[in-house]
Structure formats: C-alpha cells, structure tokens
Amino acid sequence: MRGPTGYALATRGVTECRNGHQVSLTSGTGLHRSKLPLTLWFHAAYLVSTLTPGISALQRQKQLGISRYETACQLLHKLRSALVAPDREPLHGEVEVDEGFIGGPEEGRPGRGAETKSLVVFGVEIIRYAAPDPRNPDDPQAQVEKLRAGRVRMNVIPDASTETLMPWCALNIEAGSRVITDGWPAYNGLEKLGYAHRRIVQSVKGKKTGAYLPMVHLIVSNLKRWLLGTHQGAVLPRHLPAYLNEFTFRFNRRFWRGPAFHRALGLIIHAEQWPEYDTLYRVAKGGIGAGVHPSSPANTRPKAGTHGDTAGPLDVVVT
C-alpha cells in the first residue's frame, strides 16, 4: 500500500506519497471515512449474515455497545444495501413464481385493502431429491421424491401486470428454465421469453393454497414470521426492499454460515459508496423493485374465478 515513495502518518493512520496524496486502509471501499472501528463493522456483518432469525437495530445496539440507536439503524441500513451482488447468478432449473402482499394490517382495512401492505414477487428454485419411504422402513430401496427450496429472489413491485412480471422474470430467471405459476394471465408471455411454462390452476375449493406452489408459500410464511418475530411487524413500506435483501442473502446461504460472513465482507468492501438514507429508501414511482405499495384497486389481482381460471392446453389442473 505504501509504494516506493510513500510514508506512514502515525497520527492519522494513513499513508502519504511525496505528492501529498493520502491513502488509508479503507480507501476505495464502503468503509472509507467511517468513524466506527473496523472490528465493530466486522462484528455487525457477522451478526447480520449468520444469525438465522436476524437482528433488529435495538438488539444490534445492545450487542455492539453502540450508545446511539440512530447509529445502529444507519449501520444496519448500510449493511443491507450491500448484501445484493450486482453480478449474482439468475435462478435456473425449476422455479416457482408467485406474488403476495407483505405488511401489517390496518384497523378497519383488512387484507389487501390495507395501505401498509406492499406487493412482492417471489421466485424460488425447486430441488427434487429422493428420500427413504416412511411407508416401507424395512425396504432400503423404497424411496419417495421430496422437494426443498433452493435459492430465492424477491422484489417489491408496483403491480402484478405483464409489463412488470415479464421483465422481472427475464432479469432473475435463466432462459430455458421451467417456470411454475398459478393461472394469473400476466404470466402467459413466459413461453415467448424462452421458458417452459407450467400453469397450476386451483380447482378444488377449500384446499390450502400452499399445496399448489409449496415452496413459494413456504418462503412467504418464513418471511412473514421473521418480520413479525424479529421486527414485530413494524416494517414501513419504504424499508421493505432492504429487509428483503437481508432475508434473501441469509436464506440463500443458510447452509454455509462461514462463507456467508466472508461474502458479506467482500460485498461491503467493494461497495464504492454507501447510499444515503433517502437514496436507499427513496420511494420510486413504479418499476421493478420500487418501494411502492399498491393502494389502488387496479394494482390488486382479481379474486379466483374472475381472471381466466379455466384450464387451457398448457394448464395443469391440481385436484
């Protein structure tokens, strides 16, 4: 770092060349000019990347010994903003895609009418594997096929239209993959994008929706439980995209805690500049990933049976 003409300034912890240019250990990284000790940054990155239930700003303040709650909040916001790799590999293979509303209920405005709810699109890789058949414990050759979730992607979206969902799929799912959705007509253009599309139309009233797209509903359930348990459900719509980043990062690395910490450090170091709070949580006026919650009826999906829930040639009817 010092170079042939540099020398260390003991009073400032930087190296200066003969031309007066100063370089520190954190120059060119996301930690440049931070007033917090590097050990505190590393400890915070470890907590956010490895703890299964996550950690709230108040918990972080207590564990790290930070005197001001606002400092803990800013630290957590900056870490979340760096947890998404710009060159991450898209989902591939067999992928379930669906949307759901995330957020707390409002008094007098239940369900999708609540303005605190945000529409989120989910993509989940499906991994199929063989497991011993519990019905034949004495036969070691008897096996059954089971499913588990692979990697996930999720983003806040302004609506569930074709104009929103098709670009999201093209950006997050590798061409040639098999995409499984429900009967919502906004997905009808997937074949034109090069995907093998399987539509599952719910045909049995009273059957749990999780039986049709099980991995997506598992992820949605885990996300809601995490937001409710760790953050008591107190997540503002403008903050939700950053919380989705944190959940996605940790879920995709749930089997590799050590590498997750090193990956988080790498993303933090290579973040050239931290976004300011208003930039990170700016509420855009639409587009993929915008922090806009659908408060108008035009942005909600019709009830089942009113948007083409009839089986076509490519439909798979689950009974």
Language-model region placement:
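Residue-level recognition of single "structural anchor" positions
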Residues: 1-319
